[in-house]
UniProtKB/Swiss-Prot annotation:
One of its GO terms (cellular component) is cell periphery. It comes from Oryza sativa subsp. japonica (Rice). GO terms for biological process: auxin export across the plasma membrane; auxin polar transport; auxin-activated signaling pathway. The keyword Transport applies. This is Probable auxin efflux carrier component 5c.
Length: 370
């Protein structure tokens, strides 16, 4: 049962996130410490340094031989349902190539909103209070799989979109932004629905499949977030199989960078907020859609996946509640780096985290009667 002390622990875990967010927001909006280019550089630092070290340090601490693979499989089924639903929606979109490209881009954002959650900062203390230590261990295992499987797949989707929709290379090529877009939102492609095709062309250059696959594969191979996950899994298997441990100097070097992951991600989000005209940058309609995907569609997909795998009782309840945890911070960081609906993801993280506690407690109360 959840007591006031447990609520305080969860709030205490969430409050530092908003402290870092506020510092980032004030640094741009009030104190004018950073230019737009410097803000982009800070986010790039988070993507290529803070997040990979955070992922590696987190993954190597988890015993891969002690995982509950039934729960992991149920989570995978729920995410596969989200992917299938987004892909089916994108295929039903009619119109020109630019409109279809916009639908494909929105399907990536929709998957992020429905499937990628903040399992550590909010999930660990809350689920420990609800169900005990075993629930904490399970949610950590889900977080590890999210870091080493689903985030690399998200990065692959971003790279494929960049190659196929935007036109490959280092930026927007034949697919150009609408001239009515405000300067500070030029990087957020399809903010009003679609990429605008260049005169005389379609929705962007469609590269040959194998050339695209090679380009995307090379980019992913060079992405520190991908090989941080792979190296983390490899070392975890070796370490827990033969009871080895990293030297203290190596562990200290990793942790001095990994501890910046969450804080700098929220700071970068604050910088992004400070550059927008409104705190809720994407508007009420998209905010409501994001909340529906996060707190309704995600848990429903997990219910289907968990039922298909035969989960029952408290384990089923845990799977549903962890799917209703607030939006993953890393999903915003990657969206900002790739210029895809960062305003939608930032609003989902900020507003969703604020309202998540009463929603999660409501889920806990309702599931208690099932």
């Amino acid at each position: 049962m959840i007591g006031w002390g447990d609520v305080y622990k969860v709030v205490g875990a969430m409050a530092p996130l908003y402290f870092a967010l506020g510092l980032g927001y004030g640094s741009v909006r009030w104190w004018r410490f950073f230019t737009a280019e410097q803000c982009a550089a800070i986010n790039t630092m988070v993507v290529y340094f803070s997040m990979p070290f955070f992922t590696f340090d987190f993954v190597v601490r988890t015993d891969p031989f002690a995982m509950n693979y039934r729960v992991i499989a149920a989570d995978a089924v729920s995410k596969a349902i989200a992917i299938a639903a987004m892909a089916a929606w994108a295929r039903t979109r009619c119109g020109c190539a630019a409109a279809k490209a916009g639908a494909q881009s929105w399907s990536i954002t929709g998957f992020s909103l429905a499937a990628l959650n903040n399992t550590l900062v909010v999930g660990v203390p809350l689920l420990d209070a609800m169900y005990g230590r075993w629930a904490q261990d399970l949610v950590v295992q889900i977080a590890v799989v999210q870091s080493m499987v689903w985030f690399p797949l998200l990065l692959m989707a971003f790279e494929l979109r960049k190659a196929w929709v935007v036109g490959g290379g280092g930026g927007v090529g034949p697919a150009v932004m609408s001239s009515s877009s405000p300067p500070e939102k030029q990087s957020d492609v399809e903010m009003n629905g679609a990429v605008v095709a260049a005169p005389g062309g379609g929705g962007g250059v469609r590269l040959p499949f194998w050339a695209t696959a090679r380009t995307v594969g090379l980019k992913l191979a060079r992405n520190p977030n991908v090989y941080a996950s792979v190296l983390g899994v490899v070392w975890a298997c070796i370490a827990y199989r033969w009871h080895l441990s990293l030297p203290g100097i190596v562990t200290g070097s990793l942790q001095v960078m990994s501890r910046t992951g969450t804080g700098m991600s929220m700071f970068s989000m604050g910088l992004f907020m400070g550059q927008q005209e409104r705190v809720i940058a994407c508007g009420a309609g998209l905010t409501a859609l994001g909340m529906a995907l996060r707190f309704v569609a995600g848990p429903l997909a997990t219910l289907v996946g968990a039922a298909a795998l035969g989960l029952r009782g408290d384990v089923l309840h845990l799977a549903i509640i962890q799917a209703a945890l607030p939006q993953s911070i890393a999903s915003f960081v990657f969206a900002k780096e790739y210029g895809l609906h960062a305003d939608v993801l930032s609003t989902a993280v900020i507003f969703g985290t604020l309202i998540s506690l009463p929603i999660l407690i409501a889920y806990y109360a309702v599931l208690g009667f099932v």
